Amino acid sequence: MAALATSQLVATRAGLGVPDASTFRRGAAQGLRGARASAAADTLSMRTSARAAPRHQQQARRGGRFPSLVVCASAGMNVVFVGAEMAPWSKTGGLGDVLGGLPPAMAANGHRVMVVSPRYDQYKDAWDTSVVSEIKMGDGYETVRFFHCYKRGVDRVFVDHPLFLERVWGKTEEKIYGPVAGTDYRDNQLRFSLLCQAALEAPRILSLNNNPYFSGPYGEDVVFVCNDWHTGPLSCYLKSNYQSHGIYRDAKTAFCIHNISYQGRFAFSDYPELNLPERFKSSFDFIDGYEKPVEGRKINWMKAGILEADRVLTVSPYYAEELISGIARGCELDNIMRLTGITGIVNGMDVSEWDPSRDKYIAVKYDVSTAVEAKALNKEALQAEVGLPVDRNIPLVAFIGRLEEQKGPDVMAAAIPQLMEMVEDVQIVLLGTGKKKFERMLMSAEEKFPGKVRAVVKFNAALAHHIMAGADVLAVTSRFEPCGLIQLQGMRYGTPCACASTGGLVDTIIEGKTGFHMGRLSVDCNVVEPADVKKVATTLQRAIKVVGTPAYEEMVRNCMIQDLSWKGPAKNWENVLLSLGVAGGEPGVEGEEIAPLAKENVAAP
């Protein structure tokens, strides 16, 4: 297969794109906890109906096709999330956060929930199930193995294969999508095709008994929640390899877009590598005006994911509106999403990890009643830590983010000189890692204003927490932002946000109540528009003038009283998934998350 840029960042130009089961899979599945191995034919014909129930296993119907591993239930859904990232084990951005936080909230509402993701590293808490499956890849078969751990009410399933594990080493050099930022592995198409097919096997062949309420396989009455381009073909595999053979008859798929800019565009000639029937080719077919990964006709995984899913979602209502608004913000798939429809649900956040009343990284812990004084003390500690003059009366602006075009670090860097001319006294702390050119921009700002600006261009989780607690204003200069997590973290710590008016920032930040809006910035990642620089500088000036006033103290309180947990979003997700009408699916019950987020070794960008 030719060299491919599988997660190529899509720019904004016009485009025109809108057998036998054994051929695809051999079912060499070993049963977990002593279950007998199934022959290929038995595995293919097995129809389970595992339902969420209080560990009550009924006997199989005599004379029917149902095996002994049948669990019936009175409530709840079987939900299987599939994604390339799953925090805290693997994460490069919002996708990992969602698959880390949303599933436990769904489980707390009484649903049986699984997440399937690659095993990029030797995760110390994931155990070998001894269950294997052979997946059709190209002209041969690849054997995958399933690892499992049960955390916060969720079955975390890791697909083990050298295509995943051999790319990631230790905690500092691991790369999920490519060896360096902006460069993809040549075989990403094969890697994530393997993930999709393995994820479809997991609910049927894994007999999981860790949950105190559910036992046995998940069965076939399942809702698969696919996430981003890496899972685009899953619906096609479901239809061609299973439903056409009477398996997963009532299963449904939802496809969630976390970032439309990464679509999985490949050479059109690579379609046969997917081992899908010709009837799905039109769903992948795509033409754009770019030379990467090849010039001309391509296949587009995200396009197929959108068209073949039963429901399409994204991570905020305003981002959903932006995606269908035109080519520029819909990245050439706007016409497809107008056809299918799209639902936006704002993300939550992990309120146990980001909690100023318990945060071990900050100098002074606080809640809403003590926030104003505590934040002043934390500011002084932050100033001392980064080497700025210690003075609680100097407004402190912070920027935290990945240093890539989406987050607008170049716009922020360009706005700093203007802001310094407009405001007599201000300090700025910049934290982030990413592309070297952006790192140099931030360091250059520090060199130009050594007594007022500090740039930290390395990963530092402790400093990120300290900045949230000590900053007066959080600057978010995103060109586009599907949902955004940084502003939620800021509000959790009582730090109002000065943000671009895009995506989830519009849905979560209220002008004058919890932050300040700059207006929409240009999505052209190749230039820094002077008008955008002015928007950033003038909005930060406006925010700085409010710092220290009664109005600002009220904003701090407004931020901290927000419910930013996954509880509300999980209920919205439940309503959408129930609308798919999967057999046996019923509303869950409201509950609390089972345990705080575990801290494990993670795979990072």
UniProtKB/Swiss-Prot annotation:
Reactions it catalyzes: an NDP-alpha-D-glucose + [(1->4)-alpha-D-glucosyl](n) = [(1->4)-alpha-D-glucosyl](n+1) + a ribonucleoside 5'-diphosphate + H(+)
Pathway, per record: Glycan biosynthesis; starch biosynthesis
GO cellular component, one term: amyloplast
SUPFAM superfamilies: UDP-Glycosyltransferase/glycogen phosphorylase
Domain of life: Eukaryota
UniProt keyword terms in alphabetical order: Amyloplast, Chloroplast, Glycosyltransferase, Plastid, Starch biosynthesis, Transferase, Transit peptide
Enzyme Commission number(s) from the entry: 2.4.1.242
Binding of ADP-alpha-D-glucose, residues: 91
Disulfide bonds: none
Compartment(s) where it occurs, according to its Swiss-Prot or TrEMBL record: Plastid, Chloroplast; Plastid, Amyloplast
Predominant location category: plastid
Protein name per UniProt: Granule-bound starch synthase 1, chloroplastic/amyloplastic
